[in-house]
Amino acid sequence: LDGTIHCFGEGLPNQKVHPKSPESVADVQPVATQLAASILQESEVTDGYAVVLGLSNEQLVDELLRTSKLRIIVVDSGSARMNALRQRLMTAGDYSDRLQLIVGNPDSADIPPYIANLIIVSDEASAPMDSGERVKRMFEILRPYGGKACVLTPDGKDAKLLSHASPGTLPGVKT
């Protein structure tokens, strides 16, 4: 069981190598590339663990895998969306041990405390940050002393999120 394949027969088999066809740069949405670059630059986090709550932009996950050393945990309640991402990455040969896809509620997923160097809430609809409990849960996952959170909020939701994540409501928080 060491991964060796033995073939018994006459002559040498014809070997055919199937090269991996890289995704064309034209296929990558510039928005995803810019967003990933912006998140990595602003957070100054390029390795460790990232937890992505909600999967509104699959290419953001692709770009984070491609441009960082982050181990990424994605939590989303859409099983069809997660399976499609898993199949696409496996077909392309890009599904790696650096990526874990968890189908479940981003609000109550069983994620260990203090694991995330970076948390990205990419789908505010599936993981809305409109309650203090949700924000508190997010900070329970976040690594103390340097963990960063990036919440991509629709226009006008920033003030409500900041009211739940202000230094007065959560100890040690800087906004």
Give residue ranges: language-model regions.
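A short acidic, Gly/Pro-enriched loop at the edge of an enzyme's catalytic core
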Residues: V103-V121
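Glycine-rich helix-loop-beta junction characteristic of Rossmann-like nucleotide cofactor-binding loops
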Residues: S38-V45, A109
